[in-house]
Amino acid sequence: MIVRSFSDIENTDRHVKSASGTWESKRIVLAKEKVGFSLHETVLYAGTETSMWYANHIEAVLCTEGEAELTNDETGETHWITPGTMYLLDGHERHTMRPKTDFRCVCVFNPPVTGREDHDENGVYPLLTEEA
């Protein structure tokens, strides 16, 4: 059994701040735990814009605080995401988040991330693996 709190993660290598300066993420469960998924709490900052494309991962996101516009960049369709709303990127959709307020969410990734990932120039997380 693993028990971990946010205070255990803050200011460690599990507390990732993006190079773009638009988000930060607490990586609660990672690939090295070998459970088949990773679990994160992420905050996207108010007034920013982050374009993403999880070409190598499936992501489920549950908003717990704040408001943001989610745009499917492939179709132009937009959704207003508020607390209690979930979205699932089951088709590796290119998408953009535009938080009106600080936007806090819980994210699940499959395959799991290692904790070192940040978006590249295409908004993609590289597919990294943990050494056995």
Swiss-Prot record:
Pfam family, one: Ectoine_synth
Pathway note: Amine and polyamine biosynthesis; ectoine biosynthesis; L-ectoine from L-aspartate 4-semialdehyde: step 3/3
GO biological process, one term: ectoine biosynthetic process
MF terms in GO: ectoine synthase activity
Domain of life: Bacteria
Keywords: Lyase
EC class of the enzyme, as a word: lyase
Catalytic activity: (2S)-4-acetamido-2-aminobutanoate = L-ectoine + H2O
EC code: 4.2.1.108
Disulfide bridge partners, by residue number: none
Record-annotated membrane-spanning stretches: none
Family, as annotated: Belongs to the ectoine synthase family.
NCBIfam families: PRK13290.1
Function: Catalyzes the circularization of gamma-N-acetyl-alpha,gamma-diaminobutyric acid (ADABA) to ectoine (1,4,5,6-tetrahydro-2-methyl-4-pyrimidine carboxylic acid), which is an excellent osmoprotectant.
Name of the featured protein: L-ectoine synthase
Organism in which the protein naturally occurs: Streptomyces griseus subsp. griseus (strain JCM 4626 / CBS 651.72 / NBRC 13350 / KCC S-0626 / ISP 5235)
Upper taxonomic lineage: Bacteria, Bacillati, Actinomycetota, Actinomycetes, Kitasatosporales
